[in-house]
């Protein structure tokens, strides 16, 4: 007699056959609609018969499996009247009922979910592609990110583009870009590229190209990113020459012989980061430079703010040890939390429901970035917030409400029309 595992395997095999059989039926139906002759009719009838017989076999196997499960439950009850399952170490039954069996066979504990990515391997892989396919994939994972993830969740997708190809024995073959879209149970390899890792890497490698094409993630566009980025060179230069309250106000501190400035503070921060820079980080930058990537050198670079245009979930590894860059990303993540808090405050609901809508972009960014090897300079984030926080908030997109007078007029028209055609209470606009 077949075991339950064997029955389940047989059911799975037959279900695969059923999918193929149903596809053949659909193909035969299309052919019969095009050319309704006797041969096509007989083909359609035969294929429908095959699909019906496979379905009947599946139903029979499922019935056998259900009987086997029921028999096993009854045996368990007869063997132990206390209701304790065989193999359970308890002498008396727990107050809790038995739940699902969780299969751990697919897990690899040497590479647990959430481990630090192998950024060097990821950068080496990505720089083997031409820029057009990388930017198009970035667009699909930012502007169209939600739909792309929804349609392909739990799979490993391949991006293809005519610009990306390789020659194999003189034959031109497409070179696909692989990205994994994990679900909640997935365990990612260190070198595996997820949407978050992809955005992080590409944004750090090609900020100038992203700026030239104005490729801004919707997540960033709603927090006033463009307002801060449009005159970035002037804005950052103005900020750098401002007096810094975090340093002693003595002429000896400043390179220019005046009061200590924000530039002086970042200079000190850069020295500290230079001592912390890892071999992996140096290798990443060396490889990216050799590959011709347009990386930034410091926060004054014209495209430095564009490192965050694609909403990476941590500071890109190519600019992790550049003073002020990781903190600039943290500033944007706080703005995302601020906007979400404002939106939650607008919505109708209890305080508990609103609390559930609280955002944690900053905590996530902080945790991910610090796992890469640096501590964020919280004081620098404060300086950014004091300088640009109000301007950014004033440029938030908050789903602008209708003008009150216009809303009242539209609602009155709705009320009149609903009363004409129904005795129901009109809904609010």
From Swiss-Prot:
GO terms for cellular component: helical viral capsid; host cell Golgi apparatus; host cell perinuclear region of cytoplasm; ribonucleoprotein complex; viral nucleocapsid. A motif (YxxL) lies at residues 178-181. Residues 373-429 are annotated as: Interaction with host DAXX. Residues 1-175 are annotated as: Viral panhandle binding. Its main location: virion. It is found in: Virion; Host cytoplasm, Host perinuclear region; Host Golgi apparatus, Host cis-Golgi network. Changing residue 217 to A: 84% loss of RNA binding. Changing residue 191 to A: Slightly decreased interaction with host SUMO1 and no effect on interaction with host UBE2I/UBC9. Residues 80-248 are annotated as: Interaction with glycoprotein N. Keywords: Capsid protein, Chaperone, Coiled coil, Endonuclease, Helical capsid protein, Host cytoplasm, Host Golgi apparatus, Host-virus interaction, Hydrolase, Modulation of host cell apoptosis by virus, Nuclease, Ribonucleoprotein, RNA-binding, Viral nucleoprotein, Virion. GO terms for biological process: symbiont-mediated suppression of host apoptosis. Changing residue 178 to A: No effect on RNA binding. The keyword Hydrolase applies. Changing residue 192 to A: 84% loss of RNA binding. It is an enzyme of class 3 (hydrolase). Residues 1-79, 100-125, 373-421 are annotated as: Homomultimerization. The N-terminus is required for chaperone activity and, in trimeric form, this region likely serves in high affinity vRNA panhandle recognition. The N-terminus also contains a coiled coil region, which probably participates in but is insufficient to initiate N trimerization. The YxxL motif is indispensable for the interaction with host MAP1LC3B. The central region is involved in specific RNA-binding. Has distinct cap- and RNA-binding sites so it can bind simultaneously both the vRNA and mRNA cap. This is Nucleoprotein. It comes from Hantaan virus (strain 76-118).
């Amino acid at each position: 007699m077949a075991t339950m595992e064997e029955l389940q395997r047989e059911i799975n095999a037959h279900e695969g056959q059923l999918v193929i059989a149903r596809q053949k039926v659909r193909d035969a139906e299309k052919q019969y609609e095009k050319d309704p002759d006797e041969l096509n009719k007989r083909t359609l009838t035969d294929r429908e018969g095959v699909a019906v017989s496979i379905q009947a076999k599946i139903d029979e196997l499922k019935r056998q499996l259900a009987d086997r499960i029921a028999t096993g439950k009854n045996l368990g009850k007869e063997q132990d009247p206390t209701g304790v399952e065989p193999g359970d170490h308890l002498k008396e039954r727990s107050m809790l009922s038995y739940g699902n069996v969780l299969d751990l066979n697919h897990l690899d504990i040497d590479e647990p979910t959430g481990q630090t990515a192998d950024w060097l391997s990821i950068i080496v892989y990505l720089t083997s592609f031409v820029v057009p396919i990388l930017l198009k994939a970035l667009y699909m994972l930012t502007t169209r990110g939600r739909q792309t993830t929804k349609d392909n969740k739990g799979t490993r997708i391949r991006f293809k583009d005519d610009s990306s190809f390789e020659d194999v024995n003189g034959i031109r073959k497409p070179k696909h870009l692989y990205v994994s879209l994990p679900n909640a149970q997935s365990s990612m390899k260190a070198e595996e590229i997820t949407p978050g890792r992809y955005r992080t890497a590409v944004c750090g490698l090609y900020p100038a190209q992203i700026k030239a094409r104005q490729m801004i993630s919707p997540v960033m566009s709603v927090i006033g990113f463009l307002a801060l980025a449009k005159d970035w060179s002037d804005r950052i230069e103005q900020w750098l020459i401002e007096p810094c309250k975090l340093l002693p106000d003595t002429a000896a501190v400043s390179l220019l012989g005046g009061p200590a400035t924000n530039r002086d503070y970042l200079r000190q921060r850069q020295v500290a980061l230079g001592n912390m820079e890892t071999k992996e980080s140096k290798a990443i930058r060396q490889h990216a430079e050799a590959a011709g990537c347009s990386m930034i050198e410091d926060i004054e670079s014209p495209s430095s703010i564009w490192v965050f245009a694609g909403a990476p979930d941590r500071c890109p590894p190519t600019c992790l040890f550049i003073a002020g860059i990781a903190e600039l990303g943290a500033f944007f993540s706080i703005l995302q939390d601020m906007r979400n808090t404002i939106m939650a405050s607008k919505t109708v609901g209890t305080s508990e429901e609103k609390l559930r809508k609280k955002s944690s972009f900053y905590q996530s960014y902080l945790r991910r970035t610090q796992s890469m090897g640096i501590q964020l300079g919280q004081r620098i984030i404060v300086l950014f917030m004091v300088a640009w926080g109000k301007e950014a908030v004033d440029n938030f997109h908050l789903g602008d409400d209708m003008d009150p007078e216009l809303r009242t007029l539209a609602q009155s028209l709705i009320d009149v029309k609903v009363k004409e055609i129904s005795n129901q209470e009109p809904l609010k606009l």
